[in-house]
Amino acid sequence: MQATPPPVTATLVPETQPQAEHRIGIRLVNDQAEFFDKHSGEKFTPRGANYVFVPENGAFTNTPLRVGTYDPQLTRQVFSHLKGLGYNSVRVFLDSCSRGPNCIANVTKPGLNPAYLDNIADMMLAAREAGIYILFTSNDLPDDGGYSAEANLGSGGDFAGYRNSFYLRPQAISATRRYWRDILTGLVERNAAFEVVLGWQLLNEQWMFRDQPPLSLTNGLVETTTGSYDMGDPQQKQKMVSDGIIYYIAQMKAEILRHDPTALVTMGFFVPELVAPDWYVETSSLLEKSDLDFFDFHAYPGDLSLQAHVEAFGMLGYTAKPIILGEYGAFRHLYAERDTAARVITNWVADSCELGFDGWLYWSYYPANAWIGDRTWGLVDGNDDFLELFSPHNQPDICVPVEIPHANLAYNKPVRASRSLPDEPARFAVDDDPVTQWGAGDAPVQWIAIDLEGSYRITEIRLLVAQWPAGKTVHRVQVRYAGAEGFATVHEFSGMTGDQDWLVFAPPEALENVIEIRIQTISSPSWVAWKEIQVKGESAP
């Protein structure tokens, strides 16, 4: 008797759906590149935030996609909240969690962590549900999964490991292509919502080490993916990096388009002189020659002006491809007061419009932890203060600064001085920006005077010191009353002062009918300068 075969058990295999076309594209309008919505035909302006920190155990973590940390409900709440205020984009790091069993790559074998890919796919679904677009960025090759190990094979000697190898050597190109291939095929298998991807960012910030080989070499020939270069020739060394990065971009873009044919590809850059002079970045040749669809430049208010950033990037007058300001924000150690930070941010963005930027992603939605030295104001600090203030609903045109209420009677008032350096004009003392300063460019005696453009009852005068070296100083606070010919001295500061000190004069009784303030420095070991002069009070009756 023939045995009856066991019943066949059907195995359910998820059906892979046709891949959706990316909704955001790029077009040229009157020789000016711009993003646009392929469905509506309307111009698209990226406005949103870096979604890089999330709450965890009473603090914040920078691994929002980590298995065990990723919160589908929180992600949907945040994306919906952003959309409700008119924002349309977020920037998310794919691999800030790069080492460990709950991170992007497998620990014990090559490839990526399936559970982590599930989280990426769910975030894309959340974005589709909310109507938000995601710019996914890679910080680096993961430590696990075999990617970094392959990229570093054969490094040493003419090539230091890590970044100086990652962008110039064939093993690294192969490893990085495999990384992007694994990400994209994994998301295709999960029927991910590719249409919500604004772009794939090859690197959060591209840079190399000046003080490591091959950039540190002063002689000899070096072989890279793009040829042989003489390290004794600075121009060949620069060409080596430019050629190498252009080739790297072309290779990664080709890999991405194999699996995601309508994708946009970008890369992030910053000006290294701000934080790391030994890091090398050059973008002018990439603007001209690379296959990137758009560029992401990062610039924060501080010691370096936005104009200086733009000149360093080589983007003045550039219109061939869109450029977004993918990171900007106000550092709390520089801008400790909320209103000052808000004013600096809104003016920084307005200036960026004039200099050629086409999109804006604030750093960051949630703040970094309080112990992080260079943290910025988060959009949700306070009671979502900046999130609402800078939202498209409150500020439809990001190029028009938001009006920030202030109590400083000296803010942006006419000012004159005994003398001023060309790059430290007197107006910098009343711009409500503690990073800029008026500088006389000479020793005492020097003065600066502010026309209040009205008659006021003055209750407080505050001076933010710009001084090096520290030492004993004498400063006279003088006022001119309505109807008076000259100035009257109402207070004298005398004592030890140093840079960033605040000198505060609060008269026992308000000074009535004041129309002008003058600060006269009598003695100082430093050239005379002030970062800020603030005047508090009210209109005279």
PLM segments and residue spans:
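Ser/Thr-rich, Proline-interspersed low-complexity disordered segments
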Residues: 1-19, 541
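Short beta-strand-plus-loop segments that form exposed binding edges in beta-rich domains
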Residues: 519-526
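Short, surface-exposed tryptophan/glycine-enriched loops
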Residues: 501-515
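Disordered, acidic Ser/Thr/Pro-rich linker "stalks" and the adjacent N-terminal cap
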Residues: 401-455, 464-473, 492-499, 532-541
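Aromatic-rich peripheral "rim/lid" segments of glycoside hydrolase catalytic domains that contact
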Residues: 343, 347, 351-408
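Active-site mouth of glycoside hydrolases
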Residues: 23-292, 301-304, 328, 332-337, ...
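Short, surface-exposed beta-strand/strand-loop-strand elements in extracellular ectodomains
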Residues: 471-484
